Amino acid sequence: MPRIPSPPQAGLRARAARAFRLELTHPFRHDLLGVDQVADGFEFFTDRSVVAMRVNGELKDLATIVTTTDVVEPVTIYSPDGLAILRHSTAHVLAQAVQTVNPEAKLGIGPPIADGFYYDFDVAEPFTPEDLKALDKEMSRIQRAGQRFVRRVVTDEEARAELAGEPYKLELIGLKGSDAESAEVGGEESVEVGSGELTIYDNVDPKTGETIWKDLCRGPHLPNTRMIGNGWALTRVAAAYWRGSEKNPQLQRIYGTAWPSKDELRAYQTRMEEAAKRDHRKLGVELDLFSFPDEIGSGLAVFHPKGGIIRKEIEDYMRDRLIANGYEMVNTPHITKGHLFETSQHLNWYREGMFPPMHLDEERDAEGNVTRQGQDYYLKPMNCPMHNLIFRSRGRSYRELPLRLSEFGTVYRYEKSGTLSGLTRVRGLTQDDAHIYVTEEQIRDEFARQLQFVLETLRGYGLTDFYLELSTKDPEKYVGSDESWETATETLREVAVESGLELVDDPGGAAFYGPKISVQARDAIGRTWQLSTVQLDFNQPELFELEYNAADGTRKQPAMIHRALLGSIERFFAILLEHHAGAFPVWLAPTQVVGIPVADAYGPFLDDVIAQLRARGVRAEVDHSDDRMQKKIRTHTKAKVPFQLIVGEEDASAGTVSFRFRDGTQLNGVAVDEAIERIVASIQTHELVDTAWPA
């Protein structure tokens, strides 16, 4: 980077729309109120859009002193980091407001999350809607006061003394201990403590310098509360166990959202209103697609006949695509001996996410003495170990590679009850799970092929807006050599870049056995969903001692690619349901055509039309109920049936039908043969038909 010259009046304005980097030639400290400050003749000018900075790649408060050798990059409030800082600072204001209104409240944690923030509190009584109104008022007062966020480095002993009345904060300090590297703190708790020094953030009165409130926190934060603005709102209250464990006390969690402006807050609220209308849990009941009976258990879905049709269509299309692209379909059992997951190391890394073992096969004599030792069996959380056994079941030649094994395999994950959410987070799920075994020379081409296959298949389901995310090694949770990880990561990066899609890094986000690329899809209202994953794995073939006969006559170890295109059938079902708001493309609709006679006399004519459609594989029926015609139309419109064929005297006499579409538009007098061909074509081409075709 070129150095910025430093004449006496040199300056720089950080615009939200123009990110930049600079290398300072003079040290400076930006004051906490956001007012220009001159140090050694260099003026650094900023406005409200800059809320923090990266110094040599690390996020820092604007109050941080930098030196002449530091490389500084402003962080705007509109960037992902800037939004997280805004939301984290708003969470602090919420906590201060709670303890102002209720001094007995004890603090949990308050991290930024996607589109918002939360803070956990230990209070005697749950928060009520009236409480939220009072907190909203107090937060507004704190925001207008412009209290400064001031960072202080403290020792463990100092932190314990200052936060003696906060048991949950003391627990976090205790977890950190004197050795930051051995801390047992992770996830959202890391906003409080983690590697490095302990810090407390004081909320300071800008006029008197008095500390009004404080919290254990790593930061960074906004310079002051006034910069939070008015684009925030408290959204809901929920119960949450401390540190996510049901063994710990249950706290009260207040959720909120924060945006750079009131207009952006309103836009977000509008999106949330639309999302509520599209909520798959709501639509699943309204459209009679699936349910979660209490008698079966939490997180275990039952698909009803209409939902079963949609699911079958999703799977059938996927299966046809797999076979056409060189996959071989396999099937494996739902349970297995625990030794298999010891070999795969899943018991080392995922034991807490697995259902408890079942101790089987033990035999005893009449006196109760064990005559045959039993062993532990597990519900499988992954399919890959069993696919490895299929590969290993006989000798393999390089001529067989790439070997692509695929399965609609049901797996089981012991998700905590508080994390379960409709079909998007369940305990029993079916993956379209594939494992591809390749030579080292085939890795790059096969990975590119898989990524292309994934994108083409997703487009067939009506999803078109994608970007890619590259998840790299977690330094604390991986197996294999650093060299193999680096090689695999660079291969994935090259293939991702060549796809032409946006690529976002996800540092430390990979599973323990290899880096991965995930396909992120944006739905009809702009939300992002992680869908497909393609992951390279050098570790599993080594653990299972997989080998093939190479062209030179030697025995070599294959590389392995994990590929889950839909993620899980259940979750993908939910995503499609919300993306289409229940109005599926014709090929996925449970009922594709309903015939509605204007009077009973025209029922036989429609019966013949519907019979012709059924002969062509169309899911069609005639509504012969006693309801009036207008009620029938309302019923099937509410059920989001793509085509309603209405026949009265004129149509019956002319041998035609009249189409009514989901949006209420109509196309009248269409010849029966033409109507059938149009309907069949819309199914074959995966067309999304909501309105009348051009005449």
From Swiss-Prot:
GO cellular component, one term: cytoplasm
Subcellular location: Cytoplasm
Cofactor remark from the record: Binds 1 zinc ion per subunit.
Catalytic activity: tRNA(Thr) + L-threonine + ATP = L-threonyl-tRNA(Thr) + AMP + diphosphate + H(+)
EC numbers on record: 6.1.1.3
Family matches, as CDD domains: ThrRS_anticodon, ThrRS_core
Alphabetized SMART domains for the sequence: tRNA_SAD (SM00863)
Binding positions (Zn(2+)): C384, H435, H562
Keywords, ordered alphabetically: Aminoacyl-tRNA synthetase, ATP-binding, Cytoplasm, Ligase, Metal-binding, Nucleotide-binding, Protein biosynthesis, RNA-binding, tRNA-binding, Zinc
Domain named TGS: residues: 1-76
InterPro entries: aa-tRNA-synt_IIb, aa-tRNA-synth_II, aa-tRNA-synth_II/BPL/LPL, Anticodon-bd, Anticodon-bd_dom_sf, TGS, Thr-tRNA-ligase_IIa, Thr/Ala-tRNA-synth_IIc_edit
The keyword Oxidoreductase is annotated on this UniProt entry: no
GO molecular function: ATP binding; metal ion binding; threonine-tRNA ligase activity; tRNA binding
A single GO BP: threonyl-tRNA aminoacylation
One matching Pfam family: tRNA_SAD
Subunit structure as annotated in this protein's UniProt entry: Homodimer.
HAMAP family xref list: Thr_tRNA_synth
PANTHER family named in the record: THREONINE--TRNA LIGASE, CHLOROPLASTIC_MITOCHONDRIAL 2, THREONINE-TRNA LIGASE
Stated name of the protein: Threonine--tRNA ligase
Originating species: Leifsonia xyli subsp. xyli (strain CTCB07)
